[in-house]
Amino acid sequence: MALPKDMRLKGHRTFNYIHKNSTIYHGKLMTFKVARSNPEILFTHKLTNNSNKFRMAIAISKKVSKKAVERNKLRRILQEWLLTNIKKINNHKPYWLLVNLKFGDFCNDKSRLLEEFQNLMFKSHLIK
């Protein structure tokens, strides 16, 4: 299941902001870049104030897998974990999260991938 639209990060300005203003947490399989949210950067056509919430993006390089099917499978696995554990996320502090997967052969090891993801979520203080 995909992330809801109000939880997705997109746009060059948003990613440039995250790369410049983020705290980086490294793991063996992935890297987290966590930045405080800045709603002024987002282009929203609606006048609602839902842009100051937790948002995330998952970037998976072709170095991880040449097949888009496998990269999308990894993305769906991480998004599914996030949606099932959404209540644990500290929503009182609006953050933007960019997840970059490092290259390696872990496409078949779902448990290792999810364990690393959860450890980095704790390490970055995004979940309690």
Curated annotation (Swiss-Prot):
It is an enzyme of class 3 (hydrolase). It catalyses: Endonucleolytic cleavage of RNA, removing 5'-extranucleotides from tRNA precursor. It comes from the Bacteria. One of its GO terms (biological process) is tRNA 5'-leader removal. GO terms for cellular component: ribonuclease P complex. One of its GO terms (molecular function) is tRNA binding. Keywords: Endonuclease, Hydrolase, Nuclease, RNA-binding, tRNA processing. HAMAP family: RNase_P (MF_00227). Belongs to the RnpA family. RNaseP catalyzes the removal of the 5'-leader sequence from pre-tRNA to produce the mature 5'-terminus. It can also cleave other RNA substrates such as 4.5S RNA. The protein component plays an auxiliary but essential role in vivo by binding to the 5'-leader sequence and broadening the substrate specificity of the ribozyme. This is Ribonuclease P protein component. It comes from Prochlorococcus marinus (strain MIT 9215). The lineage of its organism: Bacteria, Bacillati, Cyanobacteriota, Cyanophyceae, Synechococcales. The gene is rnpA.
